Amino acid sequence: MSDIRHSLLRRDALSAAKEVLYHLDIYFSSQLQSAPLPIVDKGSVELLEEFVFQVPKERGAQPKRLNSLQELQLLEIMCSYFQEQSKDSVRQIIFSSLFSPQGNKADDSRMSLLGKLVSMAVAVCRIPVLECAASWLQRTPVVYCVRLARVLVEDYCCLVPGSVQTLKQIFSASPRFCCQFITSVTALYDLSSDDLIPPLDLLEMIVSWIFEDPRLILITFLNTPIAANLPIGFLELTPLIGLIRWCVKAPLAYKRKKPCLSNGHISHKVAKDSGASTDRDSHLLYSKLHLSVLQVLMTLQLHLTEKNLYGRLGLILFDHMVPLVEEINRLADELNPLNASQEIELALDRLAQALQVAMTSGALLCTRDDLRTLCSRLPHNNLLQLVISGPVQQSPHTALPPGFYPHIHTPPLAYGAVPAHPAAHPALPTHPGHTFISGVTFPFRPIR
């Protein structure tokens, strides 16, 4: 690597960056022929940091700065490299060498360039870059994933009106990236404050993706070898818990949110009407999203069984439901129950539905006693009480298979079982029959 470094020092910044990609491509391609998972050594990472991210190797040396045009040209070089490299394994290891966080001073430059590269790949639909980014999101700590998600949201949902359509179109190009992007976005926007409510354009795009193909949010889960114990501090296998958080907290978060007013240019009435219209659109979108999430949950039992993970792997961890319930309880306390009764009722209804379907499908592994303890401090909700109580079961019916309890034979909660029919009573005594005498006339006189 030292010989390569000396030759690169004589080049300008752009040609050196292009040359280092070329050398590492040859190096890792040869390694892949002998080992399925080549090791990215320290020398390779240092070359990339010095000649791609412009971080000097010598201590005290001033870092080089690329101007905007040079940075754009560097992004084009990288996009072209990943597009032209036909072997996915080589692309993946080069991408990992470039952008895996190292915990050093180069990480800021690394994340900045990654955000710009993925944003460019979205704009020009470079599928190999998006696929590499999807793998990166899957194996990188969540703190870095949300940084990339924030860059894409700012570029396509905040800066230029209407640019969200460009991001929306990658749904068919790279569904795997879309799945990981949704998971990152739900980790970023947790509705804990008004600043962390997802922008309307982002919400509308995600709902349209999931409503068109609900299986989108299961792509990572369905296509990844899964261990029973998932690593902590990384993105979830699916965005299910994040989407449930959105649907459940949305009624309370939007009730808490106050409409923003312009600096005197728009009247209070106009701003209020605009905010009300936006809230109505948001409520419809969250209702649509909630339906899609329930539909996905209902399919999970089959998928978990096929992977031999039913009852062994909870895609929705009980430990993640605990802070969600605490946040709902806190929001309900902050809002005046007299003014937010409908919103509290809606949030608890959605929570109850999600809990019931998730437990039934095997996505949430817990007992009814766990739920009673968890939800004991929440405001009263009829549907939630039914879910917590669970089905009432009596001894099996003799004419039915064991374990089957028809609801018509289930007694009410407050009463004991009563037999449907009393014991058979003795037969009534029979009376002797009367003989018919044909010669006797029947006296009849009409009433006048």
UniProtKB/Swiss-Prot annotation:
PANTHER family attached to this UniProt entry: INTEGRATOR COMPLEX SUBUNIT 15 (PTHR14540:SF2)
Nucleus in keyword set: yes
Top-rank taxon: Eukaryota
Main location: nucleus
Role, per record: Component of the integrator complex, a multiprotein complex that terminates RNA polymerase II (Pol II) transcription in the promoter-proximal region of genes.
Nucleus keyword on record: yes
Annotated GO biological process: brain development; eye development; mRNA splicing, via spliceosome; RNA polymerase II transcription initiation surveillance
A Pfam family that the UniProt record links to this protein: INTS15
Record's subunit section: Component of the Integrator complex, composed of core subunits INTS1, INTS2, INTS3, INTS4, INTS5, INTS6, INTS7, INTS8, INTS9/RC74, INTS10, INTS11/CPSF3L, INTS12, INTS13, INTS14 and INTS15. The core complex associates with protein phosphatase 2A subunits PPP2CA and PPP2R1A, to form the Integrator-PP2A (INTAC) complex. INTS15 is part of the tail subcomplex, composed of INTS10, INTS13, INTS14 and INTS15.
CC terms in the record's Gene Ontology section: chromosome; INTAC complex; integrator complex; nucleus
Gene name of the encoded protein: Ints15
Localization: Nucleus; Chromosome
Name the record gives this protein: Integrator complex subunit 15
Entry keyword set: Chromosome, Nucleus
Upper classification of the organism: Eukaryota, Metazoa, Chordata, Craniata, Vertebrata
Entry's family note: Belongs to the Integrator subunit 15 family.
